[in-house]
Regions:
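Short functional linear motifs
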Residues: 46, 66-67, 136, 178
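Catalytic core of Fe(II)/2-oxoglutarate
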Residues: 192-282
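Fe(II)/2-oxoglutarate
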Residues: 1-51, 280-282
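Short, solvent-exposed beta-strand-terminating loops
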Residues: 70-71, 75-96, 196
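Short amphipathic
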Residues: 55-61, 226
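Catalytic core of non-heme Fe(II) oxygenases with the double-stranded beta-helix
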Residues: 118-127, 136-232
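Glycine-/proline-rich flexible loop or hinge segments
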Residues: 48-56, 117-123
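Signature of the catalytic double-stranded beta-helix
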Residues: 61, 68, 72-76, 80, ...
């Protein structure tokens, strides 16, 4: 990352209205969509998504800004909801009649601490990033999936996730076509994002291949994305099995999840809000 110096003070966050305070516009000129550098940036991201299922943009957020985001995330820890769930990799109910080795009998464990959008302070840098039209347009251009909108849910639109020692995201396939995350702080060890490309297909859950992988991960090539602060990642996880490996050590693994959808006005129902945030209202 190219930005150096001290972190932006918390008091200054309220005044950080310029995108250049947050994003390294020298590396990522997302504020000028009509130039050759921007077009090359988008084309490269699309190509990586097509070939690898993930497009990473290291140093997207400046060092000073990402350090301030980390400080803010740690301060939010006491307000976070601890989410703990045992689930199949498909997020389908466990089927007890299946043989013990079947993927629909195998339970993964996910545990994380989450700050809902409503709990992230107004004027914070991570809110500024999410609310930026230039960032939205850039993500929209790279994903190339039709018009995108910011999620309208007061809890789910933007989340900060803290992973303490032993916490993880178990192996799973996403229910959405894509995800957008920002790495804010790396743990002392562990916490890597690991994935296996296209382990299932549209209309075919590929139970045999998935089961073999769960028995012996060496049957597939596991790709690894280390947690590097300031990196923006776009990932297609509907057909690629993935996880966050267990975190090791006292330093939190911190990332932000920026939620975008293909139609305006999308919100969670009360059940989903209670499940993921422990409450139904902001």
């Amino acid at each position: 990352m190219s930005e150096t110096g001290n972190a932006i003070k918390t008091d200054d966050m309220q005044d950080a209205k310029d995108l250049s305070d947050i994003v390294d516009l020298g590396l990522y000129p997302i504020d000028t969509r009509d130039n050759a550098a921007y077009c090359a940036l988008v084309a490269g991201g699309r190509d990586r998504l097509r070939r690898e299922g993930a497009a990473i943009f290291p140093g997207f957020v400046k060092d000073a800004a990402v350090r301030s985001m980390a400080t803010e995330a740690v301060a939010l820890q006491s307000k976070m909801f601890r989410f703990h769930e045992e689930h199949t990799v498909y997020f389908k109910p466990q089927e007890a009649e299946r043989e013990a080795s079947h993927p629909l009998r195998r339970m993964m464990v996910t545990e994380k601490d989450t700050a809902a959008y409503a709990d992230i302070p107004q004027g914070s840098l991570v809110r500024g990033l999410y609310q930026s039209d230039a960032v939205l347009h850039f993500i929209n251009d790279v994903l190339d999936d039709g018009q995108l909108y910011r999620h309208a849910d007061p809890l789910a639109a933007l989340n900060i996730q803290n992973f303490a020692h032993g916490q993880q995201l178990g192996w799973h396939f996403d229910r959405s076509d894509f995800s957008v995350t920002l790495s804010i702080q790396a743990p002392e060890a562990g916490g890597d994002f690991e994935y296996v490309r296209m382990l299932r297909k549209e209309g075919d859950e590929c139970y045999d291949s998935v089961g073999r992988f769960l028995d012996d991960p060496t049957t597939q090539d596991i790709l690894v994305l280390p947690q590097v602060p300031g990196t923006l990642t776009m990932f297609r996880g509907r057909y690629s099995l993935h996880r966050v490996a267990p975190v090791i050590g006292d330093r939190l693994r911190i990332n932000a999840v920026l939620a975008y959808v293909n139609e305006p006005g999308v919100v969670f129902n009360d059940y989903a809000r209670r499940l993921f945030y422990g409450r139904a209202t902001a």
